Amino acid sequence: ILTQAVDELSESESYKGLFHQHKDGEPLPSARVLYDVIELARSILFPGYFGNSTINSRTINYHIGVNIERLFDLLTEQILAGLCFGSNEGCDTCNDSLREEAARLAAKFISKLPHMRRVLATDVEAAYNGDPAAQSFGEVICCYPAIRAISNYRIAHELLELGVPLIPRIITEMAHSETGIDIHPGAQIGSYFTIDHGTGVVIGATSI
């Protein structure tokens, strides 16, 4: 019975349109690694709330430096996998150029983190001001699913704006699974944005 199942599942007709053949051994972007990317980005954007909670004003420069270096390495590999997925030429013919492009895009994304933090600060303020039950900005950052979904969206949107394929959708779908809030990375959302509760909210790619 097991052998028959293996044989049937291995027939080309059974996986037509469902099989992705990796180019030059490069895997697809990994949701598990992208989870680490998001956690690292959050630890940089909201220091002390995510990642190392013992961070203080004397050690913040060190911790952010370490996290940014790790973020750059992980993100470069994931962007490379995304570029290989979207490449028509195949990674065997353009691996070096794609790797350089992946590193360039990862560095460009990291350069956007200060801007993202400024915008997310307005989102936290909007959530706090809009909810009379909120006790502090810290509570909003730690507890509100909207901030998790919005931070994923802000990260994914910047990656999409840089032309990174596939990864932005994975990142927003991770937040969708976690919070029930579905924000397409292509949506144009300004500052001071919040969602009260949010379960079942859908914001599409054409939203402005």
Q: Which residue stretches match the model-derived regions?
A:
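Structural signal for interior beta-strand "rungs" in well-ordered beta-sheet cores
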Residues: 174-208
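Terminal amphipathic alpha-helical/low-complexity segments used for targeting or macromolecular assembly
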Residues: 1-173
